[in-house]
Amino acid sequence: MDSPPKLTGETLIVHHIPLVHCQVPDRQCCGGAGGGGGSTRPNPFCPPELGITQPDQDLGQADSLLFSSLHSTPGGTARSIDSTKSRSRDGRGPGAPKRHNPFLLQEGVGEPGLGDLYDDSIGDSATQQSFHLHGTGQPNFHLSSFQLPPSGPRVGRPWGTTRSRAGVVEGQEQEPVMTLDTQQCGTSHCCRPELEAETMELDECGGPGGSGSGGGASDTSGFSFDQEWKLSSDESPRNPGCSGSGDQHCRCSSTSSQSEAADQSMGYVSDSSCNSSDGVLVTFSTLYNKMHGTPRANLNSAPQSCSDSSFCSHSDPGAFYLDLQPSPFESKMSYESHHPESGGREGGYGCPHASSPELDANCNSYRPHCEPCPAVADLTACFQSQARLVVATQNYYKLVTCDLSSQSSPSPAGSSITSCSEEHTKISPPPGPGPDPGPSQPSEYYLFQKPEVQPEEQEAVSSSTQAAAAVGPTVLEGQVYTNTSPPNLSTGRQRSRSYDRSLQRSPPVRLGSLERMLSCPVRLSEGPAAMAGPGSPPRRVTSFAELAKGRKKTGGSGSPPLRVSVGDSSQEFSPIQEAQQDRGAPLDEGTCCSHSLPPMPLGPGMDLLGPDPSPPWSTQVCQGPHSSEMPPAGLRATGQGPLAQLMDPGPALPGSPANSHTQRDARARADGGGTESRPVLRYSKEQRPTTLPIQPFVFQHHFPKQLAKARALHSLSQLYSLSGCSRTQQPAPLAAPAAQVSVPAPSGEPQASTPRATGRGARKAGSEPETSRPSPLGSYSPIRSVGPFGPSTDSSASTSCSPPPEQPTATESLPPWSHSCPSAVRPATSQQPQKEDQKILTLTEYRLHGTGSLPPLGSWRSGLSRAESLARGGGEGSMATRPSNANHLSPQALKWREYRRKNPLGPPGLSGSLDRRSQEARLARRNPIFEFPGSLSAASHLNCRLNGQAVKPLPLTCPDFQDPFSLTEKPPAEFCLSPDGSSEAISIDLLQKKGLVKAVNIAVDLIVAHFGTSRDPGVKAKLGNSSVSPNVGHLVLKYLCPAVRAVLEDGLKAFVLDVIIGQRKNMPWSVVEASTQLGPSTKVLHGLYNKVSQFPELTSHTMRFNAFILGLLNIRSLEFWFNHLYNHEDIIQTHYQPWGFLSAAHTVCPGLFEELLLLLQPLALLPFSLDLLFQHRLLQSGQQQRQHKELLRVSQDLLLSAHSTLQLARARGQEGPGDVDRAAQGERVKGVGASEGGEEEEEEEETEEVAEAAGGSGRARWARGGQAGWWYQLMQSSQVYIDGSIEGSRFPRGSSNSSSEKKKGAGGGGPPQAPPPREGVVEGAEACPASEEALGRERGWPFWMGSPPDSVLAELRRSREREGPAASPAENEEGASEPSPGGIKWGHLFGSRKAQREARPTNRLPSDWLSLDKSMFQLVAQTVGSRREPEPKESLQEPHSPALPSSPPCEVQALCHHLATGPGQLSFHKGDILRVLGRAGGDWLRCSRGPDSGLVPLAYVTLTPTPSPTPGSSQN
């Protein structure tokens, strides 16, 4: 911790500098170990850095190699060149540092951080370039190079697999890797810089392969990093293979690279202090300067630096976790553990890692710089950094505050690292020897503290530590990891791990930052601990985790937020996720996972790096499931996917799980999620928004959209929530490591199992991990990283949570990183969408989409536990919604956190699965649905509130994996701090809610407009009196009541619990009942309720509800009642779902409710005097009208029966229905107007008047146009069709103008059309719509509530105006013939008697209407025309004969536009005159329209009075 004291708080921030240098050294350490001691680490998957069989030796080798590579190794030179190439790839020339850390005062050109690190570590000015590591001699690349050959064989998946077991195989495969590295050093080292960086990135992005097969994959990547890079994108399987050793090697670099590249290009500026704030920048600059001076020394310990870098790399290119722990080995090991993952990743993705630095806690984003390719690494770092920057920027201040204040002087980087370290520290206390170190990640955490002891502690890390120690234990020791990535990122500023973590928190998707932060601490400690995910972090824990603890305990003003943001951000999202998201395209495959998972790779790293013990289970974990069992790609996809999902380190699938767990454990611990985390009330610190004040800064980083999206957490609370969430998720992984730490050996085995679960389990959990994320910590973080990120990355917050199931496949389609760090790694593809999604879901964005898919669950989970990383369990859901909750964890929150640690939300395999058994048990224990809703609910509530849009879909989509994740996100009810916390994730459609308010707005506008017709108070009083002005009643009933009812029905539960009957149906009236219980302020409401309830006339709940609204308007209390209801949350909770309008009014859309109240206010100023039984009276009057109409019809039938034939003939032939039409038109227009007029009462009145006119003065009416009455009745009887029939109701000849087309049957003017004898025009008037006719007939206008639909009314008016004159006469005639209500209607026309008419079936099917053939209709027409009584009788006898005695020219007019929908049908336009060729059975007529002929529906045509003088109008 020599360096840490130096950099205390400042270093932390500075360490956000790209981890490239650090990672490079670490990688180089691996490379050195693998390359220098090539024979030592031939292990293909065993990235020399990570898979160090001989902890001390390997570490030393790694360090030495790292430095030598950085400075002098051929690989170094190649790397320098490759670095340049890589940079070029990244769009940065050798001279264009990916991340020029503004704070790197060193001449390190664009990449002072790396150069400085290396210069400091190596003391080689030549290494000055920030990418000097890459350029000078990047042992990491070397390592990759060495590893390349194995990768060659194992290229692709095998390495991915290897990578997964990087930690496991680290020791075993270290030699092969070293050999490979050595081999590759010459050949591939040249290409390696690029490839390596890319591979790193890929590894980081690519999950299992990159991380798990760190040794082999990295090797391959080292060998042909360029190819690998290509492979990364083209050959996912191969990249993972490539990822083996090189991956691990590159892991740090890769992590750094990816994160860095991503950050660099996207938002490294943000990542560094540069983007944080001026103050932070200054601090970072100061830190960096300090670090550059002394930190140079620290950097000089390249292995340590690299380790730190790998941790930091995960965070951001610019974010260099100043791992103040003086254990170079640890940092190295951590680095290597990260590195193996990184290497695996790198291998998996050739160069992709370069694009997005690994997400090792902070090293993640730096590793690319260190490793394969300065350019690629830079790119990776830039991408990652950018992605992270988005997250980190938002959390940056947060981290800075925490880092600077919380981070004790010993570990400034610790602040970022401390975030991680804190987690680690919590885990650190039990830095168990092998797997345990994983759990006690914190012990592993001190990058600079115990190089060799740590290696022992971290069996997996031990290899890495050995490499680190061997290479530069001395150098590393006492060196602060000032992983100041050169300004590879756009900003090239140095970020603290805390910042990274914060970043990752904010964009949960960005595992990169989190990974970086965690990666630095975790990775460094995760070489051995990688297997025991916790083990790696524990090392750092000493330096950072403990600091974090102390900080937390102390007050953690700086630290808690730091940890919250750093832990979550760095571990969960920022480093890997960011990088991966940013690096989306390049890191498609394992790289992203690796990137995202670097912390997790700690587990794999431990596996890979861990001593043989570590390697065994590491192999088991990484190698067995990933390397061996699964094809590198598949395994990597599977393992890494889950791991990646769990932890960006996922690239080293097996290791990744461990890493994920380690990282997670560290995070969990830091978050209070870890076992140790529990002891340390980390949540208190996390809850404590130490950096929250800074969080409000939402930096719009200039990284591409992806990054911005990932970091699109806008508010401080959101940011905090994200970081908390990140931490929350991290805690799960960390908790798993913690658990494993508890069971180091078992953990090792479980971790092996876990990696296996991650690998195999990933494959198998591929399907299951997502849904069942058993591993509490591992699963939690990974899910958050992998699932959401992967899916989110993949689908940009879609429920790509299922990637775990699809992981083997998804790894290629959705590279493992896509799961673990998809968001960060795949930023290009996924992050942008995520960003968009986040834009859509502001809260959702941070909650669900924080950085990508993972953020949904992770970020959002973070939101849940953002303040409650520690108390994630209890306060998680609640925290998500309430930052304050995040600040203080209740015992419940603690319980929940512990619970969550034990039962992570992540997929079982996906989670680091440090403890597979615990994972499975947790899976069994966890009720995904039960758990998820709480966290998600809080988060979703938060999201809903912030975003209010489709929040629910996001939670489910964004949740890391699938609904299962979302469901599991919710803490158990017992852990819920509040009902909100326990509520399930809700999706609130703000548009729909706005629609509800809009409906009320329209109703109020109409009512106000009604009253606005006059300013006279007296007139207004009348306008408000429903008795005087029924229109007001109609407006209220037709618009306001439905609108209010819709508001009350929105989200209304189907049932409410009832003491007596258990449950009863819930309805708006139930809400009214509950809200009007007698009380001091509800006496009036209660009285109104009682009054309405006592009306026997109000027979339905709807009628009672409408009456209640009318009463509220009368007492001007509608707004008051709504406000009263709103204030009674108990009523709302009882009756409404969380997504209901009234429920959402308390959470997501309070503004809409305020708007609703404002809209209702004007109603309290209007003088309403509404009859509470207005609706009832309307209905009653409608019935009366119908009855009256029926009576009128009967009487008129009798009156007209004698004259019907004569008048029909006259109207048809002689008078030319003009006169009758006119007379009738007046009548009919009046009637139609009434009916059309639209309002029930008015229509009723008009109807009554018309009816009276027609019926009462039958003969007078005859005088007016005797049939006008009939027409009117007909119109009313078939009001529904009036509009259509108005046009076609003028059948001069058939006179049976079925007023509607539907009545066409009745008005079978044309013989073909001749409707069946209209048994009752009213009843059977409509050919097709007989039922409508019947309804119209039965209910009359009242059926329409006084008015037909607006469209109908408008059409009626139009048609009335156009056809009124012509139609009226025809209809009058028709009326005469049709009016008889019964089947005798036609009979009436022919003199039939009422009895006959009654005898006729009232409802005759349209098919029966035309039972008579055309000849029969003609006969009837002749009979009618000649006034032959016998014929009429016949027609009477044959109800069908009543077919209008249509004139020979049987023509019908189309009442509407019709497109033939079947063969043989005829298309026509409204008003077209169709010649009837004959009846076609059923409701069809065969008609011809010009040259075309076909079937025409009876209902669509009406008889056309050919002779009629007004055929034109009738045609209209």
Curated annotation (Swiss-Prot):
Top-rank taxon, per record: Eukaryota
Reported tissue expression: Widely expressed, with highest levels in brain and testis.
UniProt name for this protein: AP-4 complex accessory subunit RUSC2
Keywords: Cell membrane, Cytoplasm, Disease variant, Intellectual disability, Membrane, Phosphoprotein, SH3 domain
Annotated Pro residues bias: 428-440
Keyword Cell membrane: yes
Subunit annotation: Associated component of the adapter-like complex 4 (AP-4). Interacts with active RAB1A and RAB1B, and with GOLGA2. Interacts (via RUN domain) with RAB35 (GTP-bound form); the interaction recruits RUSC2 to the plasma membrane.
Bias (Polar residues) ranges: 66-81, 480-493, 567-579
Domain RUN, first and last residues per copy: 1031-1175
Gly residues bias (residue ranges): 206-217
Disorder noted: Intellectual developmental disorder, autosomal recessive 61: A disorder characterized by significantly below average general intellectual functioning associated with impairments in adaptive behavior and manifested during the developmental period. MRT61 patients manifest delayed psychomotor development, moderate to severe intellectual disability, and variable dysmorphic facial features. Refractory seizures and brain abnormalities are present in severely affected patients.
Organism of origin: Homo sapiens (Human)
Residue(s) carrying Phosphoserine: S536, S543, S559, S656, S781, S1368, S1380
A GO cellular-component term linked to this record: cytoplasmic vesicle
SUPFAM superfamilies reported for this sequence: RUN domain-like, SH3-domain
Task of the protein: Associates with the adapter-like complex 4 (AP-4) and may therefore play a role in vesicular trafficking of proteins at the trans-Golgi network.
GO MF, any single term: small GTPase binding
Domain free text: The RUN domain is required for the interaction with RAB1A, RAB1B and RAB35.
Location relative to the cell: Cytoplasm, Cytosol; Cell membrane
Biased composition (Basic and acidic residues): 82-92, 333-344, 1219-1230, 1355-1364, 1426-1437
Ranges for domain SH3: 1447-1506
Pfam families, sorted: RUN, SH3_2
UniProt keyword annotation of Cytoplasm present: yes
Region (Disordered): 33-105, 202-224, 229-248, 331-351, 404-445, 478-511, 550-588, 646-688, 727-836, 868-889, 1210-1261, 1286-1408, 1422-1449
Record-linked InterPro entries: Run_dom, Run_dom_sf, RUN_RUSC2, RUSC1_2, SH3-like_dom_sf, SH3_domain
Extent of Low complexity compositional bias: 405-420, 729-746, 791-801
Biased composition (Acidic residues): 1237-1251
Species classification: Eukaryota, Metazoa, Chordata, Craniata, Vertebrata
